[in-house]
Amino acid sequence: MITIEQLLDILKKDHNFREVLDADEYHYHYQGFSFERLSYDSRQVDGKTLFFAKGATFKADYLKEAITNGLQLYISEVDYELGIPVVLVTDIKKAMSLIAMAFYGNPQEKLKLLAFTGTKGKTTAAYFAYHMLKESYKPAMFSTMNTTLDGKTFFKSQLTTPESLDLFAMMAECVTNGMTHLIMEVSSQAYLVDRVYGLTFDVGVFLNISPDHIGPIEHPTFEDYFYHKRLLMENSRAVVINSVMDHFSFLADQVADQEHVFYGPLSDNQITTSQAFSFEAKGQLAGHYDIQLIGHFNQENAMAAGLACLRLGASLADIQKGIAKTRVPGRMEVLTMTNHAKVFVDYAHNGDSLEKLLSVVEEHQTGKLMLILGAPGNKGESRRADFGRVIHQHPNLTVILTADDPNFEDPEDISKEIASHIARPVEIISDREQAIQKAMSLCQGAKDAVIIAGKGADAYQIVKGQQVAYAGDLAIAKHYL
C-alpha cells in the first residue's frame, strides 16, 4: 500500500511534482487517499488503484473507462478534466519507476543486481551468469528470451527490460521466493523511456556496441543509442567492459573513478588459447574452461559473465561449472541431417551478430552454405542495409530471404530492400517454413550447412501488431531432417 502523502513526497524529492488539481483548485499538500494497486492499463483498475496515464497514444477515453470502473485519482502529465483529482507531474515514466520501487518495498535493496548491455550477446551472457550463480546461490533472471522469478519456472519475456511497474512487482516476487541475485538484460530503450530510473546495479557489464535499433520509433542516431547504452555504467557500482569494443577509450575514461575491470585481448583478463569447445584464460579467471556454445565471441561472453559473477560471490569452480552447463535456446543450436549436413539455428538479428555467426559456421563447414534470413518490420530499419553488406562479404553463401516479424510491412518488400544491398541474385520465399524446407533440400553432405538466422527459439511471427503462431525454426528444421 502507498498513501497519497508518501506518493507526493517521492515526487517532490525527485523535483517531478507540479500540483494536485481537484475541481480547479491547486493543492501542494493532499490527503485522504491510499492505494493498494498500481496500473497503467485502464482495464485493470478499481477504487484502490493508482492509475498512470502514460504513452504518446493515450486517449481520454481510456481514462473514462477507468472512472466507470471506480477510479478516483490518477497521475499524469496532462489534466484530462474528467472530474476526478489528478496528480500532475513533469515526467510520468520517472514517476512510475520511483513510485513502483517504494510501493513494492524497495526489492532492489534485497537482491544483488547484475545487468548486461550491448548490441549483441546480452542473452547468452545472462545465461552464463545464471548458471554460474546457480552453483552456490539462488539467482532469478529477466532476459530477452525467458524470465524466471524462482529459478524453476521459466516464461516467455515480453520486453528485454519490463515496464517499471512490472519490473518492481517481479523483483518483489523474486524476494518473496527467496532469490539472492537478479540477472537482467538492460536495453537502451529501458533508459530511453526510464524503465529503470532510480535503479542502481551492483555490477553493470558492457559487452559491445555497433549501429542497431536506429529508426523512427527507436533511436534517431547512433550517438543517441550509444549514450543510452552508457547510462548503465553511470548507474552501476562496479563495471565490466570489453577492452576491444568500439569507443573503448571513451568508456575507460568514463569509468576511471569507479570500480572497474576490463576483459579481452587488450586487458589482463583474456583468452590465451581457444578450441571449438574449450578455452584457457589468464587473469582473474585463470584456468581451463569447457563450453558447449561454439564461437570465440561466446567464449568472450563467458569471460564477461565470469568476471561479473566473481565480484558477486561466485568461486572459480562455480564459474567453470556454470560455463560448462550453459546452453541457450535459439543460440547456436546445431542439428545434423540424415545426409550428415548441418543445420545452425541462431538468433543473429543484426549485421554484427550475423557476421560472427557466418564466420563461426565457415570455420567448420566448407561445402555449400545456405542462409535463411529476414528483417523485422517497423523497427531497426538500418539492419536491412547491414544484412546486405554482410552477405555481400560472403560470396559463397546461397541466400533465401524470408519473413521475420514483418509486423505492418509486406515481408516481400522488406526482403527486396535487403536484396537491394546485395550485388548478386538472391531468392525470396516469404513463407519461412517453405524457405527452410527448400534450403535443407539443397544440402547434400557433411560439409554442407543451412544457417537459419533471426528468430532463434521464437514460436511466433509478429504480423500486424499481433503474435501469430509459428512452429519455430528449430522445430521446423527437425521436421525436415
From Swiss-Prot:
Binding residue positions for UDP-N-acetyl-alpha-D-muramoyl-L-alanyl-D-glutamate: S42, Q158, T160, T161, S187, R195
Superkingdom of origin organism: Bacteria
Catalysis: reaction(s): UDP-N-acetyl-alpha-D-muramoyl-L-alanyl-D-glutamate + L-lysine + ATP = UDP-N-acetyl-alpha-D-muramoyl-L-alanyl-gamma-D-glutamyl-L-lysine + ADP + phosphate + H(+)
Presence of the UniProt keyword Transport in the record: no
Annotated EC: 6.3.2.7
N6-carboxylysine: residues carrying this PTM: K229
Organism encoding this protein: Streptococcus pyogenes serotype M3 (strain ATCC BAA-595 / MGAS315)
InterPro entries attached to this UniProt entry: Mur-like_cat_sf (IPR036565), Mur_ligase_C (IPR004101), Mur_ligase_C_dom_sf (IPR036615), Mur_ligase_cen (IPR013221), MurE/MurF_N (IPR035911), UDP-N-AcMur-Glu-dNH2Pim_ligase (IPR005761)
GO cellular component: cytoplasm
Keyword Cytoplasm: yes
GO-annotated molecular function: ATP binding; magnesium ion binding; UDP-N-acetylmuramoyl-L-alanyl-D-glutamate-L-lysine ligase activity
SUPFAM superfamilies, sorted: MurD-like peptide ligases, catalytic domain, MurD-like peptide ligases, peptide-binding domain, MurE/MurF N-terminal domain
Functional summary from the UniProt entry: Catalyzes the addition of L-lysine to the nucleotide precursor UDP-N-acetylmuramoyl-L-alanyl-D-glutamate (UMAG) in the biosynthesis of bacterial cell-wall peptidoglycan.
NCBIfam families: murE, PRK14022.1
Pfam families hit by this protein: Mur_ligase_C, Mur_ligase_M
HAMAP family: MurE (MF_00208)
Coiled-coil regions listed in the entry: none
Location of the protein in the cell: Cytoplasm
GO biological process annotation, one example: cell division
Post-translational modification: Carboxylation is probably crucial for Mg(2+) binding and, consequently, for the gamma-phosphate positioning of ATP.
Residues binding ATP: G118, T119, K120, G121, K122, T123, T124
UniProt-recorded name of the protein: UDP-N-acetylmuramoyl-L-alanyl-D-glutamate--L-lysine ligase
Pathway: Cell wall biogenesis; peptidoglycan biosynthesis
Annotated keywords: ATP-binding, Cell cycle, Cell division, Cell shape, Cell wall biogenesis/degradation, Cytoplasm, Ligase, Nucleotide-binding, Peptidoglycan synthesis
Major site of localization recorded for this protein: cytoplasm
